[in-house]
């Protein structure tokens, strides 16, 4: 009976042009002499259609790979089943272009005869005898492939019609069974038809498996092997390479000395740079003596004012935003700086700073009270400042009422303490505190002023004074004092500036 062969796994050889098909028998039609296979494989590759049908004339060789046991035929489903000829009889079948064709039934003992295939080349038929010993044959490639697919549903190989036709140009298109759009439905089932129960219950433990890997032991084994072989591509550990980089020291460096500056008197306050170098503070008397000795050796007041103005203007330009604020695209947003200067050398330093700021396209407003007699240094600086686009005012009413970008304070001088009692001084302090703009003090004094201007930044010259909290964050600028000048006043000095002229200091 035909039902006895349903569910059997067979291998059908259709010649060189059509190739070899393998699959499970789903239907045998004795009238039309056709046989149908489900889940077919063509030359080891799974077909895109769920079922193919073969004519007897197209079959060159038929092998039974596995015969199902009792009860296995029930898994085939409700299929169209007809009787099969006697066992031991082989059939020669063929597939036409539309999947149907005339059936020619021949016994296994019949002689070979060529069969004509419509629109195909002639295929030489061969006789196949089915022996009972073939029932105990081992599992074919089809079973092994089907089992691997069922064990690992996460890995699926997809093939399109282009790849199949490019590998086998003479391959006939198998018959598509099912309803309309059945092929798309089968593709969807193949991609999304996995049961959720077959997914692994636990995720892969990456950390646990990584902990099992003893990297030190593996590296030691590799190192031992490379030592024995006498060659090593990455260099032997604990051995100095033959060549050095251009920035690598060959000689061992000496221990770093962070205290390179020492002063002759006891230090009341110490600062340190970003690199850790200690910078001690000096008293006002020692600082004044240092400037006097430097002036005697050629560092005149004019040169000191110029150097102070350059360093202070560089710091002010950085505080104003640097290149992000001062560029051709922001010409309409020029920063505004208010300079508060007194009639002394400290004020002359502020005027020099304002001149350099005005040269860098900064809107500068200089406040300097009117005096009958001015210092020569102030007169010279005012003469240069008047050649810029800066504005000079002598009344606080001419200062802007709106907040400015920066206020530079040069009002205080230890040698002119009486100026703090002047009305203009008190009014200038009140204006600076009400303007709410950040304040930069240039060379501020040491004393604590009860009603002075609280600075956010302070710039010291050469060596810092023991400034208090009112000075804000302290910066130090290099005004060009030679090292031997420091030694002449009893200071063992080594420059802490490095590649800069203005460096920040931190309280030690």
Curated annotation (Swiss-Prot):
Residues 1-79 are annotated as: Required for P-body targeting and interaction with DCP1A. It is found in: Cytoplasm, P-body. Residues 191-296 are annotated as: Required for interaction with DDX6. Residues 283-487 form the YjeF N-terminal domain. InterPro entries: DFDF, FDF_dom, Lsm14-like_N, Lsm16_N, Sm, YjeF_N_dom, YjeF_N_dom_sf. Residues 192-228 form the DFDF domain. GO terms for molecular function: identical protein binding; mRNA binding. GO terms for cellular component: P-body. Residues 1-68 form the Sm domain. The keyword Glycosyltransferase does not apply. SUPFAM superfamilies: YjeF N-terminal domain-like. GO terms for biological process: deadenylation-independent decapping of nuclear-transcribed mRNA. The modification Phosphoserine is found at residues 131, 138, 140, 161. Keywords: Cytoplasm, Phosphoprotein, RNA-binding. Coiled coil: none annotated. Residues 98-194 are annotated as: Disordered. The keyword Signal does not apply. Homodimer (via YjeF N-terminal domain). Forms a complex with DCP1A, DCP2, DDX6 and EDC4/HEDLS, within this complex directly interacts with DCP1A and DDX6. Interacts with ZFP36. Belongs to the EDC3 family. The DFDF domain is unstructured by itself. It assumes a helical fold upon interaction with DDX6. Binds single-stranded RNA. Involved in the process of mRNA degradation and in the positive regulation of mRNA decapping. This is Enhancer of mRNA-decapping protein 3. It comes from Mus musculus (Mouse).
